[in-house]
Amino acid sequence: MTIRQHLTLSGILKSVESRIGERCIRKTIDGQNWFIVDENHLVHLKCVQSDNINCLVVRHAKSAEEIHMAEDGGHFYPEDYHTVDEMIRAMLDEVWNAISA
């Protein structure tokens, strides 16, 4: 990952976390920032490498006790979006749509 890619993904991650933090409680569990979206849903965002391509992932858990069994939701690749705002909106949609699922 180049420095530019890292800064871009890091910036996107922080922006999404900030927007989720406006509506949800942030809680540190096992050294990771999780957001309590509702009583049955926690989310965690992370940067990963998938198929040698860097992307952001939204992880889902049903409770703090179950974060070790968290499931990866959407994988968000920067090259799939025309703008940073479009990628941020897609990630936020993943989080908010999970509430109604």
Model-derived features: where do they sit?
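N-terminal export/targeting and maturation segments
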Residues: R4-L7, Y81, D85, L92
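Short intrinsically disordered terminal tails
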Residues: M1-R4, W96-A101
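Intrinsically disordered, low-complexity regulatory segments enriched in Ser/Thr/Pro
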Residues: V43-E86
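Charge-rich, solvent-exposed alpha-helical interaction surfaces
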Residues: I12-S15, R19, M87-E94, A98
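Negatively charged, low-complexity tracts enriched in Asp/Glu with abundant Ser/Thr
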Residues: M1-L42, G73-Y77
